[in-house]
Amino acid sequence: MLDLGLSKMALIGVVALVVLGPERLPRVARTAGALFGRAQRYINDVKAEVSREIELDALRTMKTDFEQAARNVENTIHDNLREHERDLNAAWNSAVSPGGSAAADAPDGPSAASGEPSWRTIAAAPAKRRNWRVKKAVTPVWYKRATMRRTQVQSGAARVARHRPASLRRPARFL
């Protein structure tokens, strides 16, 4: 930056001593030192912020590259799945139709109108709605015994009281 040697610094100090005088020189030197320190801290903060921004920019570019690679992988997988689905639909249509390719060229029924493959509509029969509140069957007692399922549940306090030895029990008081 500035080429200040020892001789130039001594010259500046002598001029400041003559101009300011011995009484005000220490106060001015303290003020100048404080201002110089503030300037250095400000410059260091700016440098740190610039380096942080550069790192963030690098991270952003890495993130976009990673997202692009993930999108490419996803698109490749979807393309492969669509291709296999097309092959399966063609095989299904040729196997299901009695005429072979004639039925595949002119599909009829609900799958042709909705645009869905025929194997989806045939396999996916409308499911009955069940009422989850109504219990349809009871688990047999023999099954509960065989699988050692608890049929009568006790609280922890009742279980402790049941297995406590008689010597440790409190005497029962009746009026």
Curated annotation (Swiss-Prot):
It comes from Burkholderia pseudomallei (strain K96243). Residues 160-175 have a biased composition (Basic residues). NCBIfam families: tatB (TIGR01410). Keywords: Cell inner membrane, Cell membrane, Membrane, Protein transport, Translocation, Transmembrane, Transmembrane helix, Transport. GO terms for molecular function: protein transmembrane transporter activity. HAMAP family: TatB. Signal peptide: none annotated. InterPro entries: TatA/B/E, TatB. Residues 94-118, 153-175 are annotated as: Disordered. It is a single-pass membrane protein. Part of the twin-arginine translocation (Tat) system that transports large folded proteins containing a characteristic twin-arginine motif in their signal peptide across membranes. Together with TatC, TatB is part of a receptor directly interacting with Tat signal peptides. TatB may form an oligomeric binding site that transiently accommodates folded Tat precursor proteins before their translocation. Belongs to the TatB family. The chain crosses the membrane at residues 1-21. This is Sec-independent protein translocase protein TatB. One of its GO terms (biological process) is protein transport by the Tat complex. It comes from the Bacteria. Residues 94-115 have a biased composition (Low complexity). It is found in: Cell inner membrane. The Tat system comprises two distinct complexes: a TatABC complex, containing multiple copies of TatA, TatB and TatC subunits, and a separate TatA complex, containing only TatA subunits. Substrates initially bind to the TatABC complex, which probably triggers association of the separate TatA complex to form the active translocon. One of its GO terms (cellular component) is TAT protein transport complex. The gene is tatB.
